[in-house]
Amino acid sequence: MATASADAIRARHGAGADVALPDDRWRRLEVAFWLIPIVAFFAFPSYRVLGSQILITGLFAVSLDLVLGYAGIVSLGHAAFFGVGAYTAGLLAVHGWHEPISGLFVAAIVASIVGYLVSFLVVRGGDLTRLMVTLGIGLMLWEVANKAAFITGGVDGLSGVTIAPILGVFAFDIRGTTAFVYSLVVVFAVFVVLRRIVHSPFGLSVRGIREGGKRMPAIGAPVAKRLRTMFTIGAAAAGIAGALIAQTTQFVGIDTLGFSRSAELLIMLVLGGAGRLYGGLVGAAVFIVAQDYLSGIDPVYWEFWIGFLLVVIVLFAHGGILGGLDALRARFARGTR
């Protein structure tokens, strides 16, 4: 099946095309990338709270990349699974389950169940159908959380979320030190698993489904089943990100389910580059840092500059920031030959 998937990708781009196939080896740039948050932890201690938000949002963006960038499923309601994970972890803590790591697992399971059920509706239609179904599911869950205020807190949010020290030792502090380290460890661990998935024969087959059009069904690949599986994995990862935000902030707002969060997530993925796995992490970092910096300079019109940045990157860097860097590297390599 991996060979058939590779053939499907090559067929899409031409028999002689140079198509990058998944490679599970860790590269030096990847190692350097993960050293950045470690350096930032010591170099910018006053920004550890912001750093944990970047890491969590980055994982959230990676979860969308699995769905959109790899499986090719257009989604405007991915925040639904983020919110489900956040409310699951938050409600567990409110009702006496304060242990954080087990809360992450429960949130992932609940979000994956919701994602699996939704996947049957999503994979059946085309792009427009998928867009409307995911948007509708997100709006429905937001309204459920709003109406069930006696459980979720409604528009006031879910407060009283108390999280026990991690491993019984590391308590969450106001400076965000524990939150940063906890987020980094969890995000990296989940990323390693997701990276292994997309570089596996299964991940290659999903990419073949996205690239191969009608060829994959013709060779007997279970297209719907594999798309549902990838969608479910993406939902589980989003649920973990939601649980992290609930545990590190000890609060769950109804905006975790909101359309605006899904829209911002899509912007981050476009900025970083869809279908590259690291694109979600890069896009989240650029978006949040730019938002923090620009809102401090111009609290009223900062969104204009975010939009301007997005337009520039889309027009001049095909494939987002990482796509633009790849193009520059390829051009430089040709120039040195």
Q: Where are the regions a protein language model picked out?
A:
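Transmembrane alpha-helices and adjacent helix-loop boundaries
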Residues: 2-337
